[in-house]
Amino acid sequence: GKGGIGLDAYCLVLLTDCNFTGWDTAAVAQNGAWVNAMECTFANNTVGLKFNTSMAYGTAPNYVNNTFTDNGTAVCIDSLPGNEVIDFAGSVFSGNDTDIDNKAEHPIDTAKATFE
């Protein structure tokens, strides 16, 4: 990407084996949405994955085997409903200014993630 937003979601979106590079915001879940990513790469974005929703029509809380590299903020959780634990098992966070900015204090599990 060349700035802007790579994926601007307003519904449930399931991403598998996708690459997001060079965006202002790679993927964002807007109101009513949930963006799930598995085996995806987020690199050189200002924000990799962003949640800014107060309700969601469907959830998918497993964020396994993703790579977040050299982003300003890898994952930004401004607002996210529910109490499903976001699981980053197998995901790698490397060279980001901020790995996870969880303003919403949503439950997350990084026990099986790697931080470099």
Labelled PLM ranges:
Residues 1-116:
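Extracellular beta-rich repeat passengers
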